[in-house]
Amino acid sequence: MKVLLYFENQKLIAKSGIGRALKLQQKALSYTDVEVTTDPKSRDYDVLHINTYGVKSHYMVNQAHKMGKKVVYHGHSTYEDFRNSFTGSNLIAPFFKRYLVSLYKKADAIITPTPYSKQLLRGYRLSQYIAPISNGIPLEKYAASDEKVKKFRDYFDLSPEQKVVISVGLFFERKGILDFVTLAKKHPEYVFIWFGYTDLRLVPQKISRLIKGN
């Protein structure tokens, strides 16, 4: 079997969760006998595994069906996740939902990162097979390492005794950044570090003010 992994605007989404999913999916499939291509011009594949939602993604799905190919959609996004993310996102969220549903309906099967996401998609009246499969992480990259711990503490000028709380994500409310800051203020005895970045011109004012310390 041959699978076409398609990611629209790879450079634009490279640092996002969706962008990193490409490498993880390629690595996961490397352990199987499945042949993988990322060439959108390929025509000899059996399954289109699509991860993005732009106009070109819509075109790829339609082309796949015309050629009699099967389509697996990776449901990274939902209406609920889109709301309260970017400035103005709530205004266009209903239209985004309609567009998402129109794409997901064209899939022969859908993969979601969590059972919760599967539940949300079922609420959109999608009847296809939906499989919740974690995006996963490369375990070897996050294995315990005294050397890395020392470098981390040296970089942030932390003593060996200091307790550190870490979170990773974009500056989105749904990522828990408001709760993270509230918790940090309540517990000054600990060091709180948030890893991640989003252009502050794109996020709601309450998030922007929070990051700027206003």
Task: Specify the residue positions occupied by each region the protein language model found.
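Acceptor-binding helix/loop patch of EC 2.4 sugar-transfer enzymes
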Residues: 8, 12, 73-98, 140-141, ...
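Short donor-sugar binding/catalytic loops of nucleotide-sugar-dependent glycosyltransferases
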Residues: 9-10, 168-172, 198-199
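Active-site proximal beta-strand in glycosyltransferases
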Residues: 47-49, 63-82, 109-111, 131-132
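Membrane-proximal helix-turn-helix segments that form the acceptor-binding/catalytic region
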Residues: 66, 92-110
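Glycosyltransferase donor-sugar binding loop
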Residues: 137, 191-213
